[in-house]
UniProtKB/Swiss-Prot annotation:
The gene is aroA. SUPFAM superfamilies: EPT/RTPC-like. Keywords: Amino-acid biosynthesis, Aromatic amino acid biosynthesis, Cytoplasm, Transferase. It comes from the Bacteria. It catalyses: 3-phosphoshikimate + phosphoenolpyruvate = 5-O-(1-carboxyvinyl)-3-phosphoshikimate + phosphate. Catalyzes the transfer of the enolpyruvyl moiety of phosphoenolpyruvate (PEP) to the 5-hydroxyl of shikimate-3-phosphate (S3P) to produce enolpyruvyl shikimate-3-phosphate and inorganic phosphate. It is an enzyme of class 2 (transferase). GO terms for biological process: amino acid biosynthetic process; aromatic amino acid family biosynthetic process; chorismate biosynthetic process. This is 3-phosphoshikimate 1-carboxyvinyltransferase. One of its GO terms (molecular function) is 3-phosphoshikimate 1-carboxyvinyltransferase activity.
């Protein structure tokens, strides 16, 4: 699909966001192993989360969906059914990695998990190695580093693991596996990724504690169960960031995103934009589904360059492509570092972002773990490619709203992975 964009005169609107992708995945996966039924409202109906539903259905879990409301009839901790076919995770790394952890402790189950070409190219040793240390029997291409992954459910034990990278997917895979283990799992090191799994497990009755950078989970005994958790999924801050950047960069804009998840592990993009000088108001703050939420309004702003690094990176890793676009339009230099994780996303997002920004007229230098963006650029229209990466597709769409001339995007359908309504919203806010 090809979309062509030119900058509108104004941007105005109130945007009801799709449900958060991370929470939507976890709401289905965790309720699948609870005992009883749960209702999940504002579920993200993007392709990734639908892959999660299809996989748990293949494991014998009843799931019903009506528009953006999903009912999950949990099978219980040890009642998943062996799938009769390969589990296709599509483009979803979250589905593949969390399901691998969940199935690793399902004694007697044999499962093969795969995905599309992009997912099959992404490294999996980051989950395979620590799961094997807990007793999991796993294999895959490239000595277990690439999907398809083969899982033979086994008897797992507890233990301690020091996380070398801040990855919510790795952390969550280990916590899900530990539910079926014998003994407490202790996680230390880079536990500073998204904490939705920890929050949901605690709400469902699991014995889990978080003390600074140390997480401990003691598995329930065989007579215990996880309680089903009904919730309304808050709006996805990763999706909201595209509108925040559009409003900050456009010379005549005011956009409000409602019901945004304001979990501190997810507000890195807000913090970065504030540091760059964006005019941001947060109102109507409240708690929904165990997560802090609020309404965020961003207006036209004069941005300046900053350094994005260190502990901030895990809190905005998915938003870095569009933040790089903001940096290209800001005054002064922006340095992004400690973000080597970008190289193993749906694309090598360092290479693809640098190439796209350069085509738009920005001056950008790639580094091994990030990029240096000169800033001050008056972006021009260009012909750009999404490479099948949903974050890139939306980043280049925003570039088309703020650059001079016409921008043409190839592969525009990639937005369906996480934001199926993106193009409809974009049309509505243009004036």
């Amino acid at each position: 699909m090809i979309h062509t964009m030119i900058a509108p005169r104004r941007l105005r609107g109130i945007i009801d966001l799709p449900g958060d992708k991370s929470i939507s995945h976890r709401a289905v996966l965790l309720n699948a192993i609870a005992t009883g039924a749960a209702e999940v409202a504002n579920f993200l109906t993007g392709a990734d989360c639908l892959s999660t539903i299809a996989c748990v259905q293949a494991l014998g879990v009843r799931v019903e969906r009506h528009e953006d409301t999903v009912r999950v009839f949990g099978a219980g901790l040890r009642s998943l059914r062996e799938p009769v076919d390969v589990l296709d995770c599509g483009n979803s790394g979250t589905t593949l990695r969390l399901l691998t952890g969940m199935l690793a402790g399902q004694e007697g189950i044999f499962a093969v998990l795969t995905g599309d070409a992009s997912l099959r190219s992404r490294p999996q040793q980051r989950i395979v190695a620590p799961l094997r240390a807990l007793g999991a029997t796993l294999d895959g291409r490239d000595r277990g580093n690439r999907a398809p992954l083969v899982v033979r459910g086994a008897y797992l034990h507890g233990g301690a693991y020091d996380l070398p990278i801040a990855s919510a997917q790795v952390k969550s895979a280990l916590l899900l596996a530990a539910l079926f283990g014998d003994g407490t799992l202790t996680l230390t090191g880079r536990t500073d990724g998204r904490d939705h799994t920890e929050r949901m497990l605690a709400a469902m009755g699991a014995t889990i504690t978080v003390d600074g950078q140390t997480i401990r989970l003691t598995p329930p005994d065989r007579s215990e169960a996880l309680h089903p958790l009904s919730l309304r999924v808050p709006g996805d801050p990763s999706s909201a960031t595209f509108w925040w950047v559009a409003a900050a960069l456009h010379p005549d804009a005011e956009l409000t995103t409602t019901g945004v998840c304001l979990n501190p592990t997810r507000t890195g993009a807000l913090d970065a934009l504030r540091a760059m000088g964006a005019q941001i108001d947060v109102a109507n703050q409240r708690v929904e589904g165990g997560e802090p939420v609020g309404d965020v309004t961003v207006r036209s702003s004069s941005l300046h360059g900053i350094v994005i690094e260190g502990a901030l990176i895990p809190r905005l890793i998915d938003e870095l492509p569009v933040l790089a676009l903001a940096a290209a339009c800001a005054e002064g230099e922006t340095i992004i570092r400690d973000a080597q994780e970008l190289r193993v996303k749906e694309t090598d997002r360092i290479a693809t972002v640098v190439a796209g920004l350069t085509a738009l007229g920005a001056v950008v230098e790639p580094t091994e773990d990030g990029m240096i963006i000169a800033g001050g650029g008056n972006l021009r229209g260009a012909t750009l490619e999404s490479h099948g990466d949903h974050r890139l597709a939306m980043t280049w769409a925003i570039a088309g709203l703020v650059g001079a001339g016409e921008t043409t995007l190839h592969g525009a359908e990639a937005v369906d992975v996480s934001y199926p309504e993106f193009w409809n919203v974009l049309r509505r806010i243009r004036e």
